[in-house]
């Protein structure tokens, strides 16, 4: 498996120390505002929609006037996930999550300018050899002997036992040969009769 990651532009990290002096404290990164100043709802429809679109989806609650409107709620959520790829993505921290004391703390912002490119290639090959199996099957065919087929209706005198079945040709003209063929013919007739009856 081949995995390559293009990290030509790692996230640029900037650290800043701030103190919670007022609720309108903000630091900017790539033209975006990280902190938010407090806004108030006005009766104007345009100002109200701007207010709702500026809030994050988690901050919208029952007290907001447009939170129960499905279209406005969908618009707010879809606007919340839109980002500008050229300007970068900033990790936003809300004012409420900052400590209330005057103790300074570090704030770290991440900006991904080019992103991460991942290429994964999976190469596999399977080879199966069947040479030994073919040779074995050829040997099986060689070891099998083909005997003459005797039909039930045929004359047994026309068939002579093969030399390989006898002991050095001692039973070539055996006295039991005729009885053997007669018995075999009767057994075949019985078998054929059983097959027909079934």
Swiss-Prot record:
GO terms for molecular function: ATP hydrolysis activity; magnesium ion binding; nucleotide binding; RNA binding. Residues 17-33 have a biased composition (Low complexity). GO terms for cellular component: host cell cytoplasm. Pfam families: Rota_NS26. Its cofactor is Mg(2+). Mg(2+) binds at residue 92. Residues 17-72, 127-167 are annotated as: Disordered. The keyword Amino-acid biosynthesis does not apply. Keywords: Glycoprotein, Host cytoplasm, Magnesium, Metal-binding, Nucleotide-binding, Phosphoprotein, RNA-binding. Residues 153-166 have a biased composition (Acidic residues). It is found in: Host cytoplasm. It comes from the Viruses. The modification Phosphoserine is found at residues 67, 154, 156, 164, 166. GO terms for biological process: viral genome replication. O-glycosylated. Homodimer. Interacts with VP1. Interacts with VP2. Interacts with NSP2; this interaction leads to up-regulation of NSP5 hyperphosphorylation and formation of virus factories. Interacts with NSP6. Participates in the selective exclusion of host proteins from stress granules (SG) and P bodies (PB). Also participates in the sequestration of these remodeled organelles in viral factories. Belongs to the rotavirus NSP5 family. Plays an essential role in the viral genome replication. Participates, together with NSP2, in the formation of viral factories (viroplasms), which are large inclusions in the host cytoplasm where replication intermediates are assembled and viral RNA replication takes place. Orchestrates the recruitment of viroplasmic proteins such as capsid proteins to these factories. Participates in the selective exclusion of host proteins from stress granules (SG) and P bodies (PB). Also participates in the sequestration of these remodeled organelles in viral factories. This is Non-structural protein 5. It comes from Rotavirus A (strain RVA/Cow/United Kingdom/UK/1975/G6P7[5]) (RV-A).
């Amino acid at each position: 498996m081949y995995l390559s990651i293009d990290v030509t532009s790692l996230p640029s990290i900037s650290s800043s120390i701030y103190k919670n002096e007022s609720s309108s404290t903000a630091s900017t990164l790539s033209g975006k505002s990280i902190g938010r100043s407090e806004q108030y709802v006005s009766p104007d429809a345009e100002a109200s929609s701007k207010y709702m679109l500026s809030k994050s989806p988690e901050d919208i609650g029952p007290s907001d006037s447009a939170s129960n409107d499905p279209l406005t709620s969908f618009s707010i959520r879809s606007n919340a996930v839109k980002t500008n790829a050229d300007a970068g993505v900033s990790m936003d921290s809300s004012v409420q999550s900052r400590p209330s004391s005057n103790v300074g703390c570090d704030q770290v912002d991440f900006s991904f300018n080019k992103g991460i490119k991942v290429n994964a290639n999976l190469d596999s090959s399977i080879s199966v050899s069947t040479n030994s199996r073919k040779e074995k099957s050829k040997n099986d065919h060689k070891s099998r002997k083909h005997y003459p087929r005797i039909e039930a209706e045929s004359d047994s005198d026309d068939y002579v036992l093969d030399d390989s079945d006898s002991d050095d040709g001692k039973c070539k003209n055996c006295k039991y040969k005729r009885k053997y063929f007669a018995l075999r013919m009767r057994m075949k007739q019985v078998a054929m009769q059983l097959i027909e009856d079934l």
